[in-house]
């Protein structure tokens, strides 16, 4: 221990049952010997030291000795994991020196263009949890005002290089990604087994929900374990040609996960940040060919074909600079895909499609076949234009279902009981007519209000889609909840706005 450290008061580390998300937080008593009012105040940034380990964290001060005593320092659960020193160990606390890269953040706020080196330094500090959420927000807001093509390339490269980088022996490694915003739409879980059954390599790393009722990882977790590390992932892909796992556990582009956790609550969703976010993860995952799905609709992330075209050009530009073959398609984003919204309901849709069940959602089946067809045609041995027929053969024959079961077995079948919520209510049409519009944002919010994705059995089962005729009092959808309080909140939310629009005739005036 250095002379400086030995002069500072030693505080005993205590585990505090606080989940502070991605931010490191430490708590000390107002009566602590280490608390000097002229140096420390609430929400100060501090540096914790123990042996050769250091940790930057946000400081909270408490008057409750039951939480931490005067000779203790409490670490939130994320901070305790990252510091990797056990409770009971002694550590010192001192004012933190701000990361040098914060000067680049200030420059960006002033409207300056950042160098590759400056962007790399910011991302490195982000990935090592040296920034507070406020400092991350400052970087995001500064970048949202403008970003040059050079900065976008530098940001993508830095984010891809910040975490695990996967390499595969196969010359063609395919992947697909949707920019999100459409309820249901669980095409990846149908596409992966189709493509893997054909023999192409498709190591799918997926996200968990942040503002939606379910991410692909949340839905796959109903069926199988998704917290899989990089080496185990490689073994699964070697055995099955594919997987569907949570990308966060593999540590692909960790800076992106941190940025997303701050930008989503602020509703910051710039096109440049989206491109860097998606492509950095695909580059880190070792993909050679990427199919991008851009849904377009009134309540989708993209509301017009012109918006989609601008985003498409940006994806293709960045992909080309990194040697990644990027194909972009626009799809119908006017309404949910599939009948279920929420992890259990979406998983049931997926297995119904793979099992060729009579009641399987036709829109999920058809969209999945179209996407799989594009990916299959990256196989040089497959005749051009034959992708759709091959995808349908693999689905109809049961080969895709068999491959999905193989992937589930390799990842490890889920051990949790995932049942639908037992508190349910129907939302009914208030008039006769034809469904002319469905608000995707509204249904996403309603499913989250019902408890998804935390409660995997919460969500919405749709009975009516655009173009369907309804009679007054006929159910539009059923909402499932697992908790009485969430049930009451969902009832109130649905009563305020059920998210459906009606017309008297097909393509008629909406009311």
UniProtKB/Swiss-Prot annotation:
Keyword Transferase part of the UniProt annotation: yes
Entry's EC annotation: 2.4.2.4
SMART domains per the UniProt record, alphabetical: PYNP_C
Entry keyword set: Glycosyltransferase, Transferase
Protein name from the UniProt record: Putative thymidine phosphorylase
Superkingdom, natural source: Bacteria
Similarity comment: family membership: Belongs to the thymidine/pyrimidine-nucleoside phosphorylase family. Type 2 subfamily.
HAMAP family in the record: Thymid_phosp_2 (MF_00703)
Catalysed transformations (reactions): thymidine + phosphate = 2-deoxy-alpha-D-ribose 1-phosphate + thymine
GO CC field: cytosol
GO MF annotations, alphabetized: 1,4-alpha-oligoglucan phosphorylase activity; thymidine phosphorylase activity
EC primary class: transferase
UniProt record, GO biological process: pyrimidine nucleobase metabolic process; pyrimidine nucleoside metabolic process
PROSITE patterns: THYMID_PHOSPHORYLASE (PS00647)
